[in-house]
Amino acid sequence: MAYEPMKPTKAGLEAPLEQIHKIRITLSSKNVKNLEKVCTDLVRGAKDKRLRVKGPVRMPTKVLKITTRKAPCGEGTNTWDRFELRVHKRVIDLFSSPDVVKQITSITIEPGVEVEVTIADS
């Protein structure tokens, strides 16, 4: 099998080596519509900058339940209220330098959406 020779580059014309990090953006919210809107905005912004993107990965929804008696006193029929809170979560992985991610995450984030950014060496 023959290998194609590498093209020599002129001295001083090499591409500047920029430190690439794996950046994990974790989004969580009670409102799915707002969460999906922020996800699409982030992914669209990253693809406009030509970054490598993985996600959004849908994590399992956490359902927090509280069951309580309706009657304030202990008398009467046992009737119960069941309340629940659903927390939805999305994870997006980006591969780029931190200052590019700072530009991408400067978008307007919908109310009620929690954003957590973690940077690691890839």
Swiss-Prot record:
Domain of life where this protein originates: Eukaryota
What's a single GO CC term here?
A: cytosolic small ribosomal subunit
**Which SMART domains does this chain map to?**
Ribosomal_S10
- Report the record's Gene Ontology biological process terms: translation
Keyword annotations from UniProtKB, A to Z: Ribonucleoprotein, Ribosomal protein
The protein's matches in Pfam families, at most eight in alphabetical order, are given as: Ribosomal_S10
What InterPro entries does this protein map onto?
Ribosomal_uS10, Ribosomal_uS10_CS, Ribosomal_uS10_dom, Ribosomal_uS10_dom_sf, Ribosomal_uS10_euk/arc
Q: Please give the SUPFAM superfamilies that the UniProt record associates with this protein.
A: Ribosomal protein S10
Give GO MF terms, alphabetically: mRNA binding; structural constituent of ribosome
Q: Family membership, please give it.
A: Belongs to the universal ribosomal protein uS10 family.
Which HAMAP family has this protein been placed in? Answer: Ribosomal_uS10
User: Under what name is this protein listed?
Assistant: Small ribosomal subunit protein uS10y
Native source organism of the sequence: Arabidopsis thaliana
Q: What lineage does UniProt assign to this protein's organism?
A: Eukaryota, Viridiplantae, Streptophyta, Embryophyta, Tracheophyta
